[in-house]
Amino acid sequence: MGRKLDLSGLTDDETEHVLQVVQRDFNLRKKEEDRLSEMKQRLAEENSKCSILSKHQKFVERCCMRCCSPFTFLVNARRRCGECKFSVCKSCCSYQKHEKLWVCCVCQQARLLRTQSLEWFYNNVKTRFKRFGSAKVLKNLYKKHRLESGACFDILGGGLYEPNLENEGSISGSDSTFYRQSEGHSMMDTLAVALQVAEEAIEEAISKAESQRDSLDKQNEASYLRDHRQELAEELAGTILQRIIRKQKDKADLHAEEEEPECTRPQSSGVKARGEGTAAPPGRHKARAALWRSQSAFSFTTEDTLKTSSAEAAPRQPKDRAQRLLEESALPSWRSMDGLDGKNLVPLLQSPDGNWMTLKDSSRQPPTRLLAKPKSRTFQALEVASSVASAYDELGSDSEEDFDYSEALSKLRPPSQGRLKQPQPQPAQAQSSGQGPLATSPSNPEAMCSDSETSSTSSSREAGCRAKLLWLQRKAPKNPSAEKTHLQGELDVNFNPQAAGGETSDSSDPEETLHTADRRARRWRRARVGPEESNRGLPSPSAYPPALHTAQVSDNVSETDISNEAQNSRSSTDSAEEKLRNRLYELAMKMSEKETSSGEDQESESKTEPKNQKGSLSSEENNQGVQEELKKKCSAVSLCNISTEVLKVINATEELIAESAGPWEIPPVSTDRDNGMFPLGTDQRSLDKQLTSLEENVYLAAGTVYGLEGQLSELEDAARCIHSSTGETELADLEDQVAAAAAQVHHAELQISDIESRISALTIAGLNIAPCVRLTRRRDQKQRSQVQTIDTSRQQRRKLPAPPVKAEKIEASSVTPIKTFNRNFLLQGSSTNRPTASTSNTKDLMEPVLESAVMY
């Protein structure tokens, strides 16, 4: 049964004799089936009756399931059937000696039916062979007869093919079913050809995928095709049959139109042309496009075939010609084959891999003759019948390059005005391919038209596209107000229009930097006035100090802006130091005026202001300059330099306060600290550089830990919001995120411990890192606090500023102390929760502390 059966050498008499034997076998089987059908019907009725009676428990215990007679003691005893497990009487069952059990009459008939119908044999053989016995013999004889008589010339294209008679697929599973379906011979032959072509196409796809061993996607594609070969072949054969039926209907309609009178033919054709031009769906053009193999499968035919095709394509309108050129320019990945005959009239496109050619004009009917010669007549039969020659057309889908990032971004945020004004052409050829969303940029032709891949890779790539879309949605702000704030922060911070457009510029001239800084400040003020007037529900900006607005803006600084600002900050450091020094002098004078006399009038203020009039500007210009420069000093290097200069300015301010207010109580200081002496073997400049680099690392580590703490808090909030219905995949993703965040926190802690060890080594070397207590004065003339001032060196005045403080926390807190460096500095969170160093000093120096917090 599994061997190849060759009946081509039989004579006509032998063939007729074999057919008579097979026919007699079929007649006997038909009679046997009629006889067994009555038995099957009786068994089915009995089974339905038992299923109803078995629902009543009392009936099952007291009566026989077959004859419904009641059980009596010693007269009609109850016996249990060994197969159906029902209780039956003595007359409805028999004892099987070899099995040693009672079997009811219904179960005996079921055994007899299985024995006579040979169901056990056919079920076993069908699992091993798809066609066997008389069906296999009749199939071969029938094919031979059909091919010799020429009845299937229209299906096979007038040529013979070599069928694989060993385990070939068919819709018939046994001899009887094949005999019953032998009447529809034309459709069966068509299905056999379609199945064979589908299997050959799948085999070719597998071999092509296996040839590319360096690609993991191709290997996965080959394994998927091998595992689902039968299902894919059946689906492809069904698609081919649908195309054949559709084409036959089109041919019937065409013949009906040809038979119409000449007077009514132009009107009907015009109506049909208008209907096809307006109401034809995009997928229709793809379904009716004629595809041919090229290079590996076909060789080009003679010139007369091309002339025939060009003659058929010549009567087209100039508008169609222009549309064809537009489609050709929109699809550069397909090479034009119009120059085959030198007349540029055949509208052909060739795929980039050289496996396919297609006609771009799908409105007309395909030519009567093929433009290429097939490698086998099986492909010729398929192409003539169904105009389908590619297994990839049904197996594959869009590749990963078809994922449109512009569509995802358009869903997340509205496009700009410049993009709305630009027209976005969409070629009709790209729309008709049914590839989903098209790329809006004409410079990305690969996203418009890509080769179809298999269903295995398409499903994985579609999942990847969905994952990318979800990733973009997570990155986008979910709240409109948050999005507005984010955009406002970008306008406030990003002062480099070239960098925003994708270009970088280095400004080394200090004068140009000052002019650009003034222009940026004016632009920033104009951009800031609009949102403040539009937000009616929010409090006025005058209710908050300027430093709070600066802190809000600094939270939205992007990484690109920070990198650009770090480059520009060095060139404008001198001007920033002067503005900061003037601003701090003014703040210090205001503090001294409030402390000395709370009831002084404006005349005393006018006396103290001329003392520092040399280095001060107007308060409005200083405020704007401070806000602009503070936004530029977001990098670690700039913060380190600014903190050093600010501490110097605070020193000078405190000295001015001490001179204007009166004598101060200075605690005794050691002699070598007053003289600024360092231990032997140490260099002041090298220690200064090392401490500067350590402070930069501290700033970077503090920012990293602060961001990681925010991520951990968000993850904790998300974990609390998870309900019991959360899927396992979401829980696994959350666990992975928590583990990654914990690993980053651990890495940051290791960096912090390394920095602490280096600081301790510098302390042992003789560098004083711990800050001193600030100079303060008593509110009343009776109480004075001890203040330690050190003017020997810059290293002895170093203090580490607090980590970044959010605007709302700074506004709500009434106490903002200054804290020295310790091991828990980087992990203490907000500065409002830290222990105070001196309660009495906090209220006097709260404004300078707010300024230092904003600078970070």
UniProtKB/Swiss-Prot annotation:
> Which UniProt key words apply to this protein?
Actin-binding, Cytoplasm, Cytoplasmic vesicle, Metal-binding, Phosphoprotein, Repeat, Zinc, Zinc-finger
Extract the ranges annotated as region (Disordered). Answer: 251-287, 302-323, 350-376, 392-578, 592-625, 778-805, 826-845
Region described as Negative regulation of PKA-binding: spans on this chain = 232-248
> Looking at the record, which segments are called Actin-binding?
495-856
- Which Pfam families has this protein been placed in? FYVE_2, Rab_eff_C
ZnF locations on chain (FYVE-type): 63-105
Identify the InterPro entries for this entry: FYVE_2, Intracell_Transport_Effector, Myrip/Melanophilin, Rab_BD, Znf_FYVE_PHD, Znf_RING/FYVE/PHD
Q: Which domain of life is it from?
A: Eukaryota
Chain positions covered by the region annotation Myosin-binding? 143-560
Q: What does this protein do?
A: Rab effector protein involved in melanosome transport. Serves as link between melanosome-bound RAB27A and the motor proteins MYO5A and MYO7A. May link RAB27A-containing vesicles to actin filaments. Functions as a protein kinase A-anchoring protein (AKAP). May act as a scaffolding protein that links PKA to components of the exocytosis machinery, thus facilitating exocytosis, including insulin release.
Q: What is this protein called?
A: Rab effector MyRIP
Write down the species.
Rattus norvegicus
The gene from which this protein is expressed is Myrip
